[in-house]
Amino acid sequence: KPIMDEDKCAEVALEYMKTKYHEDFEVTYSQEKKRIIGRAGYAEVDVRVKGKEKEYRIMMCPDGYDDTDKDGYYDSYIVISDDYMCDIVNNKIKVELDSNVKNVIVNKFISDIYITERNISKIEGFWGFSSDFSFNEKNNTLDGLLKNENVYITYRIEVPENEFSMDYEKNITEILKPKISEDIISISIVSYPEETYLKREKIYKEKGYEEIGGLIGTDEIDFFIEEETNESK
């Protein structure tokens, strides 16, 4: 049985990313730069925009199962998914989601979001959004995304201790539930002492949420919002 050619996968992935996103990407040469799992039928290629540190992952599969030249490798490859699209969707939708939450948490909060397409077909190795997904005027709003796509949203909110309320779950659910179809929204609301919160807020505003670091809070609510037919009880 043929295996996957990691150099060819990297070549196809790089061309796909440059063509779709019009950025100058490079395949990364750090650890496990191209993780190939040929026996599982997929490969992972990591890339980054030249001059930037953040890496993105592309999931590859053989385009058919031929090995016509009998060199032990599949002849060709296709991209199944990538997670660069996650950043594009996250940045746009976060603004709207924060705006909705401001109707509940009227004072201070900071937040982080991660959105991925739901792997309805259970494709092994799927990560991020499918290669045929496009972010356009039909789905580039919160309402449009939840109406037209099957997505999984992970949303984390941090507040000072004196702002925390157990009513947040009920109130946020009431706002967001009417918008969803086959989507799932996972929400965590965490409180911190005022001094700790202000330190985290400062880093968030100056450098972004990724630079804050994990820290157990004083109180926490974790809940899912799903459509009525499969709602978590």
Q: Predicted regions span which residues?
A:
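Short, low-complexity, polar/charged sequence segments that are solvent-exposed and flexible
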Residues: D46-R48, Y65-D66, I172-P178
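Sterically constrained small-residue positions within well-ordered secondary structures
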Residues: K18, I36-G38, G144-L146
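A short, surface-exposed beta-strand/turn
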Residues: K54-Y84
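Metal-dependent nuclease catalytic core centered on acidic motifs
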Residues: D75-G208, G213, T218, D222-K233
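Short, non-transmembrane alpha-helical segments in secretory-pathway proteins
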Residues: K1-S30, V89-I105, K170-K177
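Exposed beta-strand-loop-beta-strand "reactive/processing" segments of non-cytosolic proteins
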Residues: D24-P62
